[in-house]
Amino acid sequence: MKIAIDGMGGDNAPSAVVEGIVSALKEYSEMTFYITGPEDKISLELSKYDYPKDKIVIIDAKEVISTNEHPVMALRRKKDSSIVKALNLVKDGTCDGIISAGSTGAFLAGCTLIVGRIKGVERPALGPIMPGRRGNFMIVDAGANVDSKPEYLVQFSKMGSIYYKNVFNVDIPSVGLLNIGAEEEKGNDLTKATYKLLKEENTINFVGNIEPRYIPTGDTNIIVSDGFAGNTALKMYEGSAKNILGMIKDEVLKADFKSKIGVLLLKPFLKRIMKKFDYKEYGGAPFLGVNGICIKAHGSSDGKAFKNAIRQTKIFYENNVLDEIKKEFEKKN
């Protein structure tokens, strides 16, 4: 498998990118990586490590697209940017997939415009995997499409179900529609119309509306939503988890000696919980519906996060998720 990696994407690039790749090669020696970015900077970082030289290829790219640039305009203007060159490696078939921790807008727009949509897919969607109390769940769409149509949400449900089934080995993943109430008549025009379509769709295991407070249980495998509500729910969930863990730490610091002894006994359990909520463990979010394996890593990804994004890309590839999505949408054409 060959993976293109945006060497200048993210707050900690290129050092974290190189660290993640070198670490991944120790485990996945069969893989080859194409890093895009200024050759001198990438080479300098690589010189710090001992690695198989035939497994890493540097593709020189002089420009970088920043997060404050207009995504589409930047893609058109900066043809020599690290993200554009990485996307073109997937488009021309040199690489099987791409990972970037750079500008989300530029990445999603580039995946759609350069790599291209799968035939039959109206709108690609971002589908991060999140930890739940009783299992992982996917939110789709988590921000790629602020405005959506009911038909788009049905497609999001299908792509999310295919991903979840093949990656987590769940034969019939459950799909819930993010809404303000469980009743069918609740919500706005979009959710009401989507509910009717999902209920009639026999290829989806639709379990009805799901309120945000029930998402963290993990009982529902896929939470489908427009990108605005999905992104809001995702960020609220991430922020709540971070603040709850922060409150626990604050209380521990203020605790008396006996309480601190109790906390020490609970330390292994607390570490496991904290690990579940660490974005580094999940690597990135798959962008479903484009004609390539596209993984969006967190902007502040470190070496560990990049390694796990590579692992996630490998799982996507080995479980034939892309081919399965193509097969589903070929039926409709």
Curated annotation (Swiss-Prot):
Record carries keyword Transmembrane helix: no
A single GO cellular-component term on record: cytoplasm
EC id: 2.3.1.274
A Pfam entry, by short name: FA_synthesis
Localization annotation: Cytoplasm
Pathway where it operates: Lipid metabolism; phospholipid metabolism
Domain of life: Bacteria
EC top class named in words: transferase
InterPro entries given in the database record: FA_synthesis, Phospholipid_synth_PlsX-like
Keywords assigned by UniProt, alphabetized: Cytoplasm, Lipid biosynthesis, Lipid metabolism, Phospholipid biosynthesis, Phospholipid metabolism, Transferase
Catalytic reaction annotation: a fatty acyl-[ACP] + phosphate = an acyl phosphate + holo-[ACP]
Repeat is among the record's keywords: no
Subunit: Homodimer. Probably interacts with PlsY.
Annotated NCBIfam families: plsX
Family named by the database record: Belongs to the PlsX family.
Function, in words: Catalyzes the reversible formation of acyl-phosphate (acyl-PO(4)) from acyl-[acyl-carrier-protein] (acyl-ACP). This enzyme utilizes acyl-ACP as fatty acyl donor, but not acyl-CoA.
Protein name: Phosphate acyltransferase
Organism field: Clostridium botulinum (strain Eklund 17B / Type B)
Gene: plsX
